[in-house]
UniProtKB/Swiss-Prot annotation:
This is tRNA(Ile)-lysidine synthase. One of its GO terms (cellular component) is cytoplasm. GO terms for biological process: tRNA modification. The gene is tilS. The N-terminal region contains the highly conserved SGGXDS motif, predicted to be a P-loop motif involved in ATP binding. Its EC number is 6.3.4.19.
Length: 531
């Protein structure tokens, strides 16, 4: 197979795709059956065939693996036909194909901006479909970039918003980062159209693309053609402007990153006191840079001002909460600002989880992770000397780490503690929230209220009702990772735990396991309360 003949008239398109995918070996194409994604599918399959052929020869070019997926919204009565069309096109090219069905009833309830919501549902489905090591490809092109920039201009965006889309970007989805590639972003719609006709490709037409009630369609159908008629190079110029804005933003971050990083700790909390002396412009840059670490892009002036005035400058005891983006909230604790998942604003007081089989794993609510329990017999000498073996302290057998919430091997041990085992007549449960009366901690003479204990251990108010409280019957044994009560202490209750041989002691080991995302939130406030 001669490479010159292979690329022939379409060198630019192939070159753009190769440059974008060359570092990746596992590709998932978002395939709608439209012209743009059909062109990309055709180019990818030809490149795959070419690379596979080269490997059989003397070339060191590595092949790649390709899958395609169609997202079935169910909003259009032609959706089944489109899905079947995509299936046939992929069969013809020997490309593995999968259909993802979205519950369209969720979309039909939306009263406004269904265009944006449908796009969000689609991306969520696509990211969920990714296998480990796979990257997602979409067929966005230069015309799509122009629409994106004009929409950002309509919203009053700054350079970050006007930078539009990028060819290669990391997206945050749930707790994970996924790679998104747009190989055709520097190619015009005309170039793709000419390729499609020249290769005699077949595709489907979505009639909703001409519905000018949607902003993007309005720009595509009525506005941009006028600009192009007046200024034929309009699309290229806008694309260049987006590139310049992106370079300006990258340069700004590069110049300021060292000083900004000194304000942000390893858990991405922002030490905001120095910002009091900053100008409004510099302060907004810092806040925007900080939010970008959570993939909260293009925050408005209003949002940045609200973070500063309503959260950072709020009274110490106000416990202000501000929604940031779609999935996060902003909160303050002492001299730092924190970005937290939205579900951490809800109270867990009503939760009571019976732990019927104490040697089994128990799953905590609100994605807080899981708790494991294990009965151990430890040499009494080692226990006295506080020399509990490392294997007992920070390691778990695989049987205690079932995958939960679709995590992919990123669980981390947040805390390990050793308590007395329950007696036969004691039922074990996990609860959350506030406890009345005085609590007597191990190795403490006087009792204290729970609120005072939280303050002593520097546990933020928004974290307190997310700490699992371990009970035997109605008796608090431990706030996992924070403290152990007298009733749960191995030392206080030692005489009841020593084995008959007088050389060993029976302990109950409790381990709190979390995903990496929540581990980073909790780890500064939770400890190994050993015994």
């Amino acid at each position: 197979m001669n490479s010159t003949n292979f690329f022939s008239h379409d060198l630019y398109l192939y070159h753009q795709v190769i440059r974008c995918i060359v570092k990746y070996r596992n590709l998932l194409l978002a395939y709608s059956g439209g012209m743009d994604s059909t062109v990309l599918l055709d180019i990818l399959t030809k490149l795959k065939k070419y690379f596979d052929f080269q490997v059989k020869g003397t070339s060191k070019i590595l092949p790649f693996f390709l899958r395609a997926v169609y997202v079935h919204h169910g909003l259009n009565n032609k959706a089944d036909y489109w899905a079947d069309h995509c299936l046939q096109q992929c069969k013809m090219r020997n490309v593995p194909f999968h259909i993802i069905y979205i519950n369209h009833s969720d979309l039909s309830k939306i009263k406004c901006n269904i265009e944006a919501m449908a796009r969000d549902f689609r991306y969520k489905a696509l990211f969920n479909a990714l296998k480990p090591e796979e990257v997602l490809l979409t067929a966005h092109h230069m015309n799509d970039q122009v629409e994106t920039v004009l929409l950002a201009l309509k919203r009053g965006s700054g350079p970050a918003g006007l930078s539009g889309m990028t060819q290669d970007i990391l997206y945050q989805h749930n707790e994970y980062q996924h790679r998104l590639l747009r190989p055709l972003l520097k190619c015009s719609h005309i170039q793709l159209q000419e390729y499609a006709y020249r290769k005699k490709l077949t595709w489907v037409e979505d009639d909703t693309n001409t519905d000018v009630r949607f902003d993007r369609n309005f720009l595509r159908v009525q506005v941009i053609p006028l600009f192009q008629k007046r200024w034929p190079a309009f699309n290229k110029v806008v694309s260049r402007t987006a590139q310049l804005c992106r370079e300006q933003e990258n340069l700004l971050h590069e110049l300021l990153s060292e000083s900004l990083d000194q304000l942000i700790d390893i858990d991405n909390a922002l030490f905001f006191y120095p910002l009091i002396k900053y100008s409004d412009v510099r302060r907004r840059v810092v806040l925007r840079y900080w939010l970008s670490r959570f993939f909260i892009n293009m925050p408005s002036y209003k949002l940045l001002d609200c973070i500063w005035k309503e959260v950072a400058l709020s009274k110490v005891d106000s416990q202000s909460i501000l929604h940031v983006g779609k999935k996060y909230i902003c909160r303050r604790f002492r001299k730092k600002l924190y970005i937290l998942p939205d579900n951490m604003k809800s109270s867990l007081d009503i939760f009571l989880l019976p732990w019927k089989n104490f040697n089994n794993t128990i799953l905590l609510p609100n994605e807080l992770g899981l708790l494991t329990s294990q009965s151990l017999t430890v040499n009494l000498f080692l226990f006295y000397k506080n020399l509990i073996p490392y294997t007992h302290l920070n390691m778990l057998s695989d049987i205690f780490l079932p995958r939960y919430h679709n995590n992919v091997g990123d669980e981390k041990i947040l805390s390990v503690c050793f308590i007395r085992p329950p007696m036969n007549n004691e039922k074990v449960s996990i609860q959350f929230g506030y406890i009345q009366g005085l609590l007597h901690l191990a190795n403490r003479d006087r009792g204290r209220k729970l609120k005072k204990i939280w303050q002593e251990y520097n546990v933020p108010p928004w974290l307190r009702n997310h700490i699992p409280l371990l009970f035997y019957n109605d008796t608090l044994i431990s706030a996992i990772g924070i403290f152990i009560t007298r009733n749960g202490s191995c030392i206080v209750n030692m005489n009841n735990l020593i084995c008959n041989n007088k050389k060993s002691i029976i302990l109950q080991k409790i381990t709190w396991v979390q995903s990496d995302f929540y581990y980073r939130i909790f780890k500064n406030f939770v400890y190994n309360t050993l015994r």
